[in-house]
């Protein structure tokens, strides 16, 4: 499992790159988050819950590293991404993502990988705070072409559930690289 200290170091470091804090207006939060990812529908679950959203965002060449929490249970839905995929790792709480190949329950030991061609519906628990890595599709295609030695004709697709437990060193290495 990814070390808690590494995640803590990464999230503390990302605090230097706030996009917004204490967002409580649904339309404003949806607009700001949609500017980083894609336009989407956002609905707060339960009449007694209110948003207290925050997001940190660091844009790199072909990726971005983000933390996002809504402070309330929310439903989110959007059309397929065309230019990127997302690795979504809850640092606290649980998120259920309904994608093309079923439902992924993401939590600290299982990240959700959202492919570029999947329509998306998510339910975030009220205490769900996530590390979200956005990777441009062109970078993935170039990397695969380099590794395979020939052009990739179709979208590269990955399994939607990434087990972050011991033994899956590749995924941990990617997160570790970003965390250090």
Locate the predicted segments by residue.
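Alpha-helical bundle regulatory/interaction domains
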Residues: 2-23, 31-44, 48-50, 96-180
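Conserved hydrophobic/aromatic beta-strand scaffold that supports enzyme active sites
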Residues: 57, 65-67, 86-87, 111-113, ...
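A short glycine-rich, His/Asp/Glu-containing loop-to-beta-strand
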Residues: 31-33, 50-72
């Amino acid at each position: 499992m990814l070390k808690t200290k590494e995640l803590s170091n990464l999230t503390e470091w990302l605090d230097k790159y706030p996009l917004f804090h204490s967002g409580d207006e649904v339309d404003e939060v949806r607009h700001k988050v949609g500017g980083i990812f894609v336009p989407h529908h956002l609905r707060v679950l339960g009449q007694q819950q209110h948003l207290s959203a925050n997001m940190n965002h660091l844009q790199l060449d072909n990726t971005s590293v983000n933390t996002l929490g809504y402070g309330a249970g929310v439903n989110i839905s959007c059309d397929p991404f065309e230019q990127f995929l997302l690795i979504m790792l809850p640092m606290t709480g649980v998120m259920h993502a309904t994608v093309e190949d079923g439902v992924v329950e993401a939590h600290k030991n299982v990240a959700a990988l959202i492919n570029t061609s999947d329509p998306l519906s998510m339910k975030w628990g009220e205490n769900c705070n996530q590390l979200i890595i956005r990777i441009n599709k062109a970078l993935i295609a170039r990397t695969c072409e380099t590794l395979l030695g020939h052009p990739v004709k179709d979208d590269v697709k990955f399994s939607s559930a990434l087990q972050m437990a011991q033994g899956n060193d590749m995924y941990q290495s990617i997160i570790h690289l970003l965390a250090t």
